[in-house]
Design a protein with these regions (language model features):
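Secretory-pathway/luminal and periplasmic proteins that interact with or process carbohydrate-rich
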Residues: 23, 31, 103-105
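The canonical Cys-X-X-Cys-His
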Residues: 17-28, 165
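Electron-transfer interface patches adjacent to heme c in soluble/periplasmic c-type cytochromes
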Residues: 40-112, 117-158
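Juxtamembrane amphipathic/hinge helix adjacent to a transmembrane helix
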Residues: 152-170
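Electrostatic cytochrome c docking/interface patches
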Residues: 1-15, 26-37, 45-46
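Residue-level signature of catalytic and energy-coupling elements of molecular machines
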Residues: 13, 80, 165
Length: 170
């Protein structure tokens, strides 16, 4: 559930974004100092969110150069400050929970929400590994995901983690 007044959730989401997403995805319409709005002090921003020698007033740029992203993934990883607003919270939440193992792809991962996404499942150690199951029936194919290998988090913990991350991004 999205609650932009829940500063604890927003702070957890900000820390998760910096730890897991900012290497490849920028949030270039956001400055680090805006994290004061959710209760971080400048010192906390520098200690918890800025790892690349940037200043508190700088834009949140990806550490990856666009050329590298295109070489590695075939496409430049999108800016998540744009994706969150264009796709919305429900889409992003579903997307981050819908990765599954797929040996036919370059990354070894696919996504039930966005087929053939170039992004590998960077959160698989937290969520675990899912596999796609397809059942045919009267209403056509029914696709679902089953957890094959558990991750470091329970399903409920991972759902909360993703919820905090999405809450922060939107």
């Amino acid at each position: 559930p999205i609650d932009t007044t829940d500063n604890a959730s927003l702070q957890r989401g900000a820390e998760s974004f910096v730890s897991y997403c900012l290497t490849c995805h920028g949030a270039s319409y956001m400055r680090y100092n805006r994290h004061r709005d959710i209760g971080f002090s400048n010192e906390q921003i520098l200690n918890k969110l800025v790892y690349t020698g940037q200043k508190v007033g700088d834009l949140m740029q990806s550490a990856m150069r666009k050329k590298e992203g295109e070489e590695w993934f075939g496409v430049v990883p999108p800016d998540l400050s744009v994706i969150a607003r264009s796709r919305g919270a429900d889409w992003l939440y579903s997307y981050l929970r819908a990765f599954y193992r797929d040996d036919s792809t370059v990354t070894g991962w696919n996504n039930l929400v966005f087929d053939r996404a170039a992004m590998p499942h960077v959160l698989y150690q937290l969520q675990g590994e899912q596999r796609l199951t397809i059942k045919s029936g009267d209403k056509g194919e029914q696709k679902s995901l089953l957890l094959d290998k558990t991750g470091n988090m329970t399903v409920a913990e991972y759902d909360k983690f993703v919820g905090d991350l999405v809450n922060y991004l939107v």
